[in-house]
Amino acid sequence: MANDGNGDNNDDPLRQYLMNPRINPPPPSLLTLPENNDVTIPMPITPLELKNRLIFGSFVRSRKESSLPIDALSQNPSTSSSATTSFSDSTDLLLPLTEPNKPVRKSKPTINFHRSKTAPAMAAINNISHPNDPKTDQQSDSKTIVNQAVALLVVYLSLGVLIYWLNRDSYNVKQTHPVVDALYFCIVTMCTIGYGDITPDSVVTKLFSIFFVLVGFGFMDILLSGMVTYVLDLQENYMLETARNESLNLNDRDKVRSYIIDVKKGRMRIRLKVGLALGVVVLCLGFGVLIMHFVEKIGWLDSFYFSVMSVTTVGYGDRAFNTLAGRLLAAMWLLVSTLAVARAILFLAESRVDKRNRERAKKVLGESMSISQFLDADIDCNGCVSKAEFVIYKLKKMDKITEKDINPIGFQFDKLDRTNSGRITLLDLLESSTKDLPTATSI
């Protein structure tokens, strides 16, 4: 392609292309067959161009997308422009034949939008809509209950001591100290033990005792649901965190830990709760035996008998605390021991219910579905049972949920589903966040 003598390469197609780049014109709708001209061999397309053609449809190769060597080699100065343009772009062979005199439509690239699960904007939206952390709210609520329980306990005991102090002559009692006797009387009355060593002897004190007993029932429930539950939850969370953070390599220790703590479900096993509660009861019994034997100067058998009667709130009245130190220690011991026994009884009942629920769940999951059960599980009556319907049906059979539990959830779903399409979209959620929704629905 080079000229002789002067070395002028003006006829070199590659040099001409680099000095004066061009963009190939779009090919005609019908390809003309070259007859008198030279036929140029179409150059193969690159894999990237083939991928773009399959994804975005037909396109005209631009100067940036075209390969310089391919366009330069495909240019032949001895041939006519019609033959060159007919086979200049090999990708045009993929185009289907169209009708004559009809312009070729360029298909627009299809853009599909997909939600990114790692998009940080979703976290910002969630923070705006739900700024509070449920765990933080639950901990703050528990602390609030504990503070209220402590305040009510102080008010209850202070009021009882004040009334006893003002009417201390209206009680049949072996007096030691008015404040200690009043505190001892309030604790014994609130715990419903009733030794009979301190009894009211006037109208005012009897009315006060009636009021004090009735209020004491409700107050014991507050203590059980508030302070004791909070302390046990703290202990459970501490043990769970310790079990998660420990790196134990021994299989035997792993088996013991899995037997005591269910790390996967994030809770203590009910057998451990019952064992701890019974252990606390045994400690309370032992502490009571020591108080009665060394302080009240009672024999070991009578001390154990009196301790059991006191912890279980039976209180026959044949024994009682008569010394100042004994009544002062009994005021603290009886409050803790009666709460521990009540909690142990609740854990025992919970273990029985948990065992019954496990047996029922095992039975429900083991049985096959009959035609009548299929019809019951088909909630929307469309002739088929979806996975959600199957799960709801099985949970109902296990007595884990009822219609009263499902209806409020469905009512809240209908409020979020603005378009009644049977599904909640992000647009529906953003629209509903601007309006006040009930945080809880009464069941």
Swiss-Prot record:
Gene Ontology cellular-component terms listed: plant-type vacuole membrane
Residue ranges of every copy of the EF-hand domain listed in the record: 365-400, 404-439
Low complexity compositional bias, start-end: 72-98
Primary localization: membrane
**Keywords, ordered alphabetically:** Calcium, Ion channel, Ion transport, Membrane, Metal-binding, Potassium, Potassium channel, Potassium transport, Repeat, Transmembrane, Transmembrane helix, Transport, Vacuole
MF (Gene Ontology): metal ion binding; potassium channel activity
Organ and tissue specificity: Expressed in roots, stems, leaves and flowers.
* SUPFAM superfamilies the record matches: EF-hand, Voltage-gated potassium channels
Instruction: Please indicate if the UniProt record lists Transcription regulation as a keyword.
Output: no
Binding positions for Ca(2+) 2? 417, 421, 423, 428
Location of the protein in the cell: Vacuole membrane
Mark the transmembrane ranges.
145-165, 208-228, 275-295, 328-348
UniProt topological domain (Cytoplasmic) ranges: 1-144, 229-274, 349-443
Pfam families in alphabetical order: Ion_trans_2 (PF07885)
Membrane topology summary = Multi-pass membrane protein
Intramembrane annotation ranges?
A: 181-200, 302-321
Region annotation (Disordered) maps to 67-109
Family that this chain belongs to: Belongs to the two pore domain potassium channel (TC 1.A.1.7) family.
Q: What is known of its domains?
A: Each of the two pore-forming region (also called P-domain or P-loop) is enclosed by two transmembrane segments (2P/4TM) and contains the GYGD signature motif which seems to be involved in potassium selectivity.
Subunit relationships: Homodimer.
Q: What is the protein's name according to its record?
A: Two-pore potassium channel 2
User: Which taxonomic lineage is given here?
Assistant: Eukaryota, Viridiplantae, Streptophyta, Embryophyta, Tracheophyta
Which gene is annotated as encoding this protein in its UniProt record? TPK2
